[in-house]
Amino acid sequence: MPVSSLFSFGVNLIHRGGRARPLQSIYRMELRFGLFLSVALIPVIFAQDISHGSIVVDGTMTVAQTDDNFVCATIDWWPHDKCDYGQCPWHYTSVTNLNLSHPFLAKAVQAFNNLRIRVGGSLQDQVQYDVGNLKSPCHPFEKMKDGLFGFSKGCLHMERWDELNRFFKETGVMVTFGLNALHGRHKVKRSLWGGDWDSSNAQEFLKYTISKGYHIDSWEFGNELSGHAPGGFFEEEWFVKLLQTSGSRVLDVMSHHMYNLGAGVDPKLISKILNPDHLNKASYTFGNLTHVIRRHGPWSSAWVGESGGAYNSGGAHVSNTFVNSFWQTLIGGNYGLLNATTFVPNPDYYSALLWHRLMGKVVLSVESDASPFLRSYAHCSKGRAGVTLLVINLSNQTNFVMNVQNSINLKLAVNEQNMNQGGFTHTLKKTFSWVGTKASNEALFREEYHLTPKDGYLQSRTMVLNGIPLEFTDAGNIPSLDPVHVNLKSPISISPLSIAFIVFPNFKAPACG
């Protein structure tokens, strides 16, 4: 299909270099980890209740798969004078002026080992590339009353592009770059643009990138051009139409954005975050999106391109504290993984890093008899045998004490009970002790990573791991993220308003290979 007709929808897509191929569906996992966005916005209330229960993990089959680089972060285009609700939180963190030589920045990125970085955001459709026969001067973004998002066109010098790619190579990141989809088009009215896309500037930019040997994993076309459409917020009709019109093997990925908390200034932010029913609303989006992809574009996959929780730079004193275990921007705004001025990691950096290191691609089924305020998710462990469980306690007053069970052993216990009536209780207790491991005389342990805010203050800027505050070392390195080893036979205790990663190295899960 000709470029002009394919892109006439003015929507967002991602194309990866080489032969088109489907990717693992990140959206499938976003349903699970998207609920890991925040724990609370109010002071800690010490446990008043203790609730006992069970978590059952089914390791016999895969229910979904994520991409290898599920965790990703954005380097945005917003200039320092981008302001929302009387605050200007972006500072000098733009693609064009971020201090790439800051030692904290490189070390924070390298700790992920192949972090996906998206270069893009709202202003990407105003960016010109200073290469080839550019017909206008290459000026930085400036405030402009009638401009898109209140700014003029901006420009990326190739010297800066060279610097960025040196940084990408040195830190081992995987790059997704968002192209300007409005070049050559004209504004018809407030949110409507007409005319054909002029691909000449993008083509010159691509040629330059290839000539320099820079490896860009994927190219994204446009950003929220139509609001509720691909590259923006999910709307079934738009997604179906694009897949039907483009046809087989044209689009590798359909991306959409998630800001299910609403505006960062919303006074109801707290109640939304602590309400499991509100968090569950995301499941409808993912369910519908799954249906659309399977029926109309099974060659494609879906990515959540942005998921900052609250839009318009996030919530001040919320998105940059312990309560925000979501991520979107690498640095800048209130929802960055790193502080915009000191480059020191915000609390959610560490929860994202632990996810990246511990949770593998294969998603397993989990069932729990606990209240909806305890959220449980299981994956095959990353790079090792066993299963890793993520547990989030959204309750501000209940301590959950949970036995973790393997569905395989439960089935064995039921079969044994059928053969020997009257011994079921004893058999079940015996089953609970092994959590899916093969019988052994040696002491067995699990690894636990409990995340809490410093001094119990949920809007703290310091994350605490197993009672130890996480802070840069004197040499400016990321601190060690060490687990505590707990006897496998003991139940798991999840304190109010906390997050825990639990690794079971010997969990028997055929789906994990």
Model-derived features with residue positions:
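Non-catalytic accessory regions flanking glycosidase/transglycosidase catalytic cores in CAZymes
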Residues: 2-3, 23-253, 282-305, 310-513
